[in-house]
Structure formats: C-alpha cells, structure tokens
Amino acid sequence: NRVSGLNSRQFTKYWKVESESPDYKVTFQGDTAEIVSPKGLTLWRKEKMSGKVTIEYDACVVVESDGDRLSDLNCFWMASDPQYPDNLWKREKWRSGIFLNCYSLQLYYLGYGGNHNSTTRFRRYDGDESGITNPKARPAILKEYTDAGHLLKPNHWYHIKITNENNRVSYYIDGERLVDFRDAEPLREGWFGFRTTLSRTRITNFSYE
C-alpha cells in the first residue's frame, strides 16, 4: 500500500495511536505527521501485513527546544497478540502504550537510539507475558550497536527500510543493513508500529508492499 496516510485527511483511516499519556499530540504539515509523546507511544498502522513484506518510511527526532529529547526512533513489525492473533486491538486499552506490556506481543523490535541515545538494539519478542514482571524472561538482544555512527543525530531525516522474506529479516537505515537475521520460526504476519517515548518525532513517506 503506497498510501502513507500521514496527513490530517487520511490519518484516522490508516493509523491508530496507543499512548501511555493522554497528553500526546499529533500534528500535520502536508504528508508529514509530528508526534509529541510525553510517555510511551505506539503509532500502529491499521492494516495487517503478511508474507513477503517490504516497509519503508522516513523519520526524524526533532531537537529544537529545551523539552526535546534525542532518543527512541523505534519500530515494531509483524506484531500480533498470541491470545488474539487476528485482533491486535483486543487488548489495546490494557497495553495502553506501556512498553512493558508489549512483552505480551509477538514481534520484531528495533530500538534505534534507545536508552537516552546510548544503544541501538534488535530483538524478537515471543509473546511471553512473564517478561512484564520478570526481567529474566525477556527476549535476548540479537544485535546491538553502541557506537556514535549507529545512534541518533538530531533533526536528521533517516530513511528506514524493513524486509521480511521467507525466514530472513532485514532492517536498513540510510542504506546500511543493521539487521540480517535468519529466524528459525519466522513471524509471517502482523502489524507495523512506529514506537517512541518522551520525544518529538516526525514521520513521512510510509509505504509497504
């Protein structure tokens, strides 16, 4: 679907905000959405994706004033709730954008510039809810970068490309492949979510096929 839907006219048709704080804001300039997230927030694309998938979008973390924090240009993909595989929204109110509650989902997760822009990490979540309260049950880090070249630059527009093909999962940022993961039990369907926390971000040019 080449319709990005990141404008005021189409936004609610294609996207759904799941936010820990009721005080989040989404504003639009043309086909670019700006998200101010005081706490954890997932911007879910409403369509379920399946099979061979390529997702692309442009995004940046805005740092222009005192309250802006350079951190967390993250995303979920092939996300689903094992308890309700065909309905991601069934427990949306319970998840409520809270990061810990996302351990209840199966998904691939890339956190770019997480932990106050000190880490970039890739994980595969298996939907084990015990991870919500038990750190030892949380999914392993499958790939990690901590060097400055793989952390966020302020106000820089990144081009992100994600591919899922058979059992191979790849994540590219500005043309560099950060993740090349072969999954013994690949997640073949699910939803995409743009994820951030305590930040001001912009996203545009979203497409998938």
Describe the residue ranges of each PLM region:
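Extracellular glycan-recognition regions
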Residues: 1-209
